[in-house]
Amino acid sequence: MDKVEVSELHVRIGQVKIGSPGQVLTAILGSCVGIGFFFPQRQIYGLAHCLLSQSSSQPVASSAAQTGRTREDGQLVGNGRHVDKAIESLLKMMDIQDEERRQLRVVLAGGANMSMPFDTPPSQLVGSVNAKFARQAIRSAGLRLLGDDLGGLNGRRISINCDSGEYDIQQIPRLGGTV
């Protein structure tokens, strides 16, 4: 049996990447939220690594930022800094039509509150705000949530296998330090 080589595509903060068979999309998340899109009917998958929940309403200056597409090492990369723009980028980069949205499956990961004191009001916990907004944005976009692993104090690693269409979310335990 021939061994198939799998290419790992790491999605950094603020990026959106699209994967296809033979690739695994991964991200390491703390308070950031990872948004995974699954469209197995076309064997296309996407992952966004979002730093914050919402973008400002200010217009974007560059044409690359407007389309949500730039090139990095030959890989198409979109605008994933904010949850709202990341969802737009994923839909655009995966060429998802309105009538196809119900076929899409979405997973969410991250949104941990890793470095805030325990007495911080919930409205100021970046991870909690990101997680809550991501859930609302997915629902508002008419997308179907397959699963999530959000909140708490631990970071996470999300992987999307573009061969099998399976995903894995692993919690990353905290080592030392105080909260």
Curated annotation (Swiss-Prot):
Claim: Membrane is one of the keywords in the record: no
EC id: 3.5.1.44
Chemical reaction(s) catalysed: L-glutaminyl-[protein] + H2O = L-glutamyl-[protein] + NH4(+)
InterPro entries reported for this sequence: CheD-like_sf, Chemorcpt_Glu_NH3ase_CheD, Cytotoxic_necrot_fac-like_cat
GO biological process: chemotaxis
Segments crossing the lipid bilayer: none
Enzyme kind, highest EC tier: hydrolase
Keywords linked to the UniProt accession: Chemotaxis, Hydrolase, Plasmid
Cross-referenced CDD domains: CheD
Entry GO MF terms: protein-glutamine glutaminase activity
Purpose of the protein: Probably deamidates glutamine residues to glutamate on methyl-accepting chemotaxis receptors (MCPs), playing an important role in chemotaxis.
Alphabetical list of PANTHER family matching this protein: CHEMORECEPTOR GLUTAMINE DEAMIDASE CHED-RELATED
Entry's family note: Belongs to the CheD family.
Name this protein carries in UniProt: Probable chemoreceptor glutamine deamidase CheD 2
